[in-house]
Amino acid sequence: MQIHGSGMLMCPYFGAYVEDIDPEHINAIGGEDWFSNYYDHTDGTEKRYDNLYMNASPMLFPSSRAADVRPSAAAIEGMPNNKLDFRYVSHRIYKGKPKFDCLPYVRDELNEAETLEITVRDFSKDIEVILSLSVFEKYNAVIRNTVFLNKTGKAIWLKRAMSVTQDFPRADFDIIHFPGEWLFERQFRRETLAEGTKVVASSSGRSSHEHNPFVMLADKDATETNGEVFAVSFMYSGSFRCETNVGKVGVTRLTMGIDDTHFKYEIKDGKSFEFPEGLIVYGNRGFESVSHHLHDIIRNNIVNDNNSSVYRSVLLNSWEGCYMNFDTAKVLEIIRAAKSAGTELFVLDDGWFGKRDNDRCSLGDWYVNENKVDLKKIVDECHATGMKFGIWIEPEMGNFDSDLLRAHPEYAAVDVETDPWLSRHQVMLNFADDKVVDCIYDSLEKVLSAYDIDYVKWDHNRTLEDYFAHNLDGEHQDEFYHRNTLGYYRLAKRLTERFPNVHFQGCASGGGRFDLGTLFYFPEIWTSDENDPVQRLFIQYGTSFAYPPSVMGAHVNDCAVTGYKTKAEVALFGSYGFELDPRKLSVEEIAELNCVTEVYKKFHDEVVMDGDMYRLISPYDGKAFAINMVSKNKKKALFLMVNLLKRLRARRFVKLRGLNPELKYVNSFDNKVYSGDYYMKVGVNMSQGLNEFQSRLITLEEVK
């Protein structure tokens, strides 16, 4: 970090540890920049800052409209001159890191981080920014925390809020991002950066199926195990924007923060605005090293303590088995059949509340439909089998045909006079209004208090574009997206604190809100509504670059493309369960599933929950997919290969990674014992014939 002679904050270098840094050497680009000169109004003369190039120098918190045409960190409206030009005021260093009251944050209960807190100010307006850079050395991670303070004497409007701004004195990067859609989320995409600005964004009010608030910049020749990689993740569940700008002199600026398409936030005099946190993780041993750091910081410092290492019970969800067509007798039949299939947790999905027999009514009416189900009897009998019990909710949504919106039409975040668009026949509730959040909390608190519920699936089945907040005037409508996200966090915080032993799973039509903000409150997220195992290979592969398998909901359904063995073995590398009617399973199919379920129960805690993942063959290879996971103590491992093309006569060895080279391991394929060194240098012999979409799961355990 450098305080330039101008008072501007610079970050000349970000990367592997270096003992000595020469900022002047790094900043020098040769030649002369017209924007190094400035007019000093105090004496009416032209002056020059040495070694300052406004369009090229590596700024820590780039100003707005201050001769730097690259993307800025912040922008305002409401002043006679909206230029922002921040200069250094003070700094301090302390152990630990800051927290938020209303936003998720990276936890540091053990004070492992060291924080550099810097105050900068626009002296012409008296706007201050407190920048906190918290370093977790063991994760190679820097957490950016920003507070924007208005001391101008009048209200201003914040129009841009970028939580991460990082400059690099180079332009030879590939960018890796993860576009997708419903049923095909987070697909791996690698592109070469070129001059101009590359944008990855969501403007739909949530982090979205289409893009994820996570990108990587990497050496052009970076692989899983080699090359420099810079990963940036945004801890936010609303709309986001990431811009990667390659400038005219070969420098790169990456910014990530709140999308400004529907964002303009009033900050009154004396008040502040907290930017959501952003993370930058560095690795110089390829994508694998960055993923391992991200997986560890999520498990240890983001997922809450009550759930970070809790065993994920084998789950059966009722949705694909019976949809909303059930009564008490049918549910009890399914529970008994689920038990015989090795299930440890039964989740009753949509249809248990209000008058909900179809998706056109009753969202918002969170009381049990006693004419349809005897929920107490169901819960008690489920527990009597030794299984846990869970329910589905969608707190942020409503139907016009509901008691809630008949009594309070203003709770809907729409203007009915404009013929608002519906999605799944529903509208978004106005979670920018505390009264609405309180109302939903009260009704859900009653249900969770009245029944012995172990698990809650929290869904979110539409985007927010067609919005109108009745509690906000026209001038403040563009505050809705952010206020609505804060309302989501407020309800999640209240419910998880009120019911600390209830396991919450996040969901948004599958993976439409898969982000660090959600993981702060919920220890797992439903990865995708797509359960086809071949499609899931691509989805879970892409997701794994940023998120550990322990937070990925991964289930088996009854699609006809592959057998249950392949489905179950793919789902094993996540929070495992079933989406089917267990009454329809044959004895042979139950036996096939039970074989994989037993592996899950034996290996999940040490290997999948807490272990390290190694991506061996990408599904984009087109021929096969392979991964292995290894426990932290290196004593257990799982290996999975899925064939994508029929190969009957091919010599094929897959080299594992992450084992202890000196330990001996017995494998479950042929019961032979080899050293970790052998498995990693020679590999597992996968030369036997496999048809397309057939899989091979092999366990490895230490032998002495």
Question: What label would you give each PLM region?
Answer:
Residues 39, 49, 53-97, 222-238, ...:
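Glycine-rich, aromatic-flanked loop segments that form ligand/cofactor-binding clefts
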Residues 215, 224, 618-660:
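Carbohydrate-binding surface patches
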Residues 307-442, 455:
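Aromatic-lined carbohydrate-binding/catalytic grooves of carbohydrate-active enzymes
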Residues 146, 270, 382, 504, ...:
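Conserved, mostly hydrophobic/aromatic
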Residues 5-245, 261, 664, 668-670:
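Polysaccharide-binding surfaces and accessory modules of carbohydrate-active proteins
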Residues 645-704:
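C-terminal beta-sandwich/jelly-roll accessory domains of carbohydrate-active enzymes
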Residues 88, 265-284, 693-700:
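Short Pro-Gly-centered flexible turn/kink motifs
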Residues 399, 403-438, 482-584:
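Glycan-recognition surfaces
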